[in-house]
Every structure is written in structure tokens, then in C-alpha cells.
């Protein structure tokens, strides 16, 4: 699980800034803390353009750079009013009772990438530019040069895809945790799965059926269920999906009325809810990080509160990091004070956070 992220000269964060997810001495809401003492998530609040989404981006970039094709040397990540041509991100994770620290720095002028990886403070990997040395499989170290090290790619990614870290169960478990992570931008309606988790509603229903989603609705008295079929009937209404019998559609049925309502005719809030539920339930059940930007877009305050409570209660080794403008989530009946981060932009000093 993620325990810390540190941003330095990154986007709006001119000065080195750390977000810590280790629990503090608060005793309320013990269900919001995993059994290893790490918080199951946190909220970032603040004014528009304060830097809230930048923190989410800092976590997302690790996933992008490891599992997607993305160029590290892009100058868009450098703080434009900062000092120097380098930006850096560092992360601390707790995996199988071992502390993993990973750091990378990018010089966007010289196009040089630096990386370091430690497990319990023992150096496992170091990289400078086009040369690297790994101690993961060989304690004496294995040297790599420009034939193995790409100027635009994390060497950690290269080693992972070449070896899957079969010689190191801790790193293998770390990668498995990261691949279970999912990013959601509620405003753009963009959902990215970094592993095998199915986040398309239709494909999720094809493989998992409606049971888990309807169970979520029933448990929290939503007074509605969904059906996923070629046709749906209720009252004097019957809908049939165009095409042969293999073509299916999503229908809502409100209890007490039972008339089917096609997905596209449902309220925007219900559409948004159903779109993110596969990702939401996947992370709860499988682990990983659920990163949500603009969580408050398209949701009623009570629904946001319900979903945060549900995640904290049901998740085990999973985390939900999210941006929201809903101040009702700052209640101590929903989140602990150590799960709440206020983000502020202080002119020439850039973005700052306060726990």
C-alpha cells in the first residue's frame, strides 16, 4: 500500500511536498485503517487551481510510466516557475511488511533520467542517464548500458517487463498491487485500468453479471436494480435491444414501479454511478489504488458520502485517493482528520498541503 508520495518542482509544487498515508494517533473510524497501519485513502480539498489534481497526477504517472507508453522527458511536468530544469517524484510503499522506496528525477533540458529503488533501505536499483545497475537478482549487481536503458523510459519498467521480478517476491507483489489500480476522471468520464480489471460496464456485466452491483444497491437501500439482457419487461412496457439475441442492453428498474428504463434514459447521476461501479468494486475486492479526480462531478453529496463509507468498510488492502469539492465529506463520521488534506496555492511558493 502507498504510504508516502513526495513531489518536487513538479507542476504547481515548486517546493518539495510530501503526502503521508500512515495513520496518526486518532482512534476514530478504525475501519478506515488497514491492518498494517496504513490509511485506506485520503481526500484532497481546496480552491480551484490549487494543485489538488496534481497530487493525483503524481501517483497516476507512476502507473502510466510503468504500464503505459508515456514519455518521461516531457517538459509539461516541470514547475514553470520553479528552480532548475529537474522535477522528481518519490514513493514509499509497504508491501508484505517490507518498505519499498522508489525515486526518479527527470532533467528535461539534458534529457537525463535518474532512478533509485530500495527495499528496507537496501539499494536494489540505481540508474543515471543511459547506465544502470541492478541488485535485484544478483547481490553483486548487474550492469546495464545504452543497449538496455532507454532514454525515455523508466528502467524499472524495462526490468519488470523483461523479468517480472520472479527472483524477488516483494517486487513482484508490488507490481501486482500497482497493476490492480484504476484511475477515474469523473469530469471527463475517463477510466483507466492498469491491469486486467474490466471497467467497461457492459463487459463487466458480461463476465460478472448484475449480482454484485444489485447487492450494492440493496445493501444501501437504493430502491432499484439493474438488468442486463436482450429484452426487459415490466408493467405494460417491454424493451427489446436491436439485433440478434446476443445483443444486450442495461435497464434500470425502480422498486415499486418495475418498469424498465434503458440506461441512456436514466438520470445522469445514475449513469455516472453505474459507469464507475465496476472500477469501484474491482479495487475493493482485489486491492490496488482507486484514484478519482473530480469525484463530486455528477454526484449528490449523500451518494459521495455513502461510497466513501462503503469503500472504507469493505476494502482490505486497497486505497482510495480522491479530489472533491464536497465539504460534507470532511465530517469525522466519514473520514478521519489524518485522511484530510487541504491544498492551497500560495503565489510564488506554489502549491502547499496541510493535513
Where are these regions (language model features)?
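Short acidic-glycine loop/turn motifs at beta-strand connectors
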Residues: 95, 107-109, 345-349
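Long, charged, glycine-rich C-terminal linkers/tails
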Residues: 224-243
Amino acid at each position: 500500500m502507498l504510504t508516502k508520495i513526495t513531489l518536487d518542482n513538479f507542476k504547481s509544487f515548486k517546493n518539495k511536498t510530501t503526502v503521508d498515508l500512515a495513520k496518526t494517533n486518532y482512534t476514530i473510524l478504525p475501519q478506515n485503517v488497514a491492518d498494517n497501519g496504513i490509511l485506506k485513502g485520503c481526500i484532497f480539498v481546496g480552491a480551484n487551481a490549487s494543485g489538488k489534481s496534481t497530487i493525483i497526477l503524481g501517483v497516476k504517472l507512476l502507473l502510466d510510466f510503468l504500464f503505459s507508453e508515456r514519455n518521461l522527458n516531457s517538459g509539461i511536468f516541470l514547475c514553470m516557475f520553479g528552480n532548475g530544469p529537474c522535477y522528481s517524484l518519490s514513493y514509499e510503499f509497504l508491501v508484505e511488511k517490507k518498505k519499498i522506496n522508489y525515486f526518479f528525477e527527470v532533467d528535461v533540458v539534458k534529457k537525463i533520467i535518474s532512478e533509485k529503488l530500495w527495499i528496507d533501505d537496501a539499494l536494489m536499483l540505481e540508474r543515471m542517464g543511459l547506465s544502470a545497475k541492478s541488485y535485484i537478482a544478483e547481490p553483486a549487481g548487474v550492469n546495464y548500458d545504452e543497449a538496455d536503458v532507454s532514454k525515455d523510459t523508466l528502467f524499472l519498467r524495462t526490468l519488470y517487463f523483461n523479468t517480472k521480478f520472479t527472483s524477488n517476491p516483494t517486487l513482484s507483489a508490488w507490481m501486482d498491487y500497482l497493476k490492480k489500480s484504476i484511475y477515474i476522471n469523473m469530469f471527463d468520464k475517463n477510466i483507466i485500468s492498469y491491469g486486467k480489471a474490466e471497467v467497461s460496464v457492459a463487459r463487466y456485466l458480461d463476465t460478472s453479471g448484475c449480482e454484485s452491483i444489485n447487492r450494492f444497491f440493496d445493501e444501501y437501500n437504493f430502491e432499484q436494480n439493474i438488468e442486463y439482457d436482450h429484452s426487459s419487461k415490466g408493467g405494460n412496457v417491454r424493451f427489446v435491444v436491436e439485433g440478434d439475441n446476443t445483443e444486450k442492453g442495461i435497464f434500470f428498474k425502480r422498486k415499486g414501479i418495475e418498469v424498465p428504463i434503458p440506461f441512456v434514459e436514466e438520470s445522469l447521476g445514475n449513469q455516472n454511478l453505474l459507469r464507475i461501479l465496476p472500477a469501484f468494486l474491482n479495487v475493493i475486492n482485489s486491492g490496488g489504488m482507486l484514484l478519482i479526480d473530480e469525484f463530486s462531478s455528477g454526484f449528490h453529496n449523500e451518494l459521495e458520502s455513502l461510497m466513501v463509507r462503503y469503500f472504507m468498510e469493505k476494502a482490505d488492502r486497497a486505497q482510495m485517493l480522491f479530489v472533491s469539492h464536497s465539504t460534507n465529506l470532511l465530517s469525522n463520521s466519514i473520514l478521519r482528520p489524518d485522511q484530510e488534506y487541504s491544498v492551497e496555492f500560495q503565489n510564488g511558493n506554489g502549491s502547499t498541503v496541510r493535513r
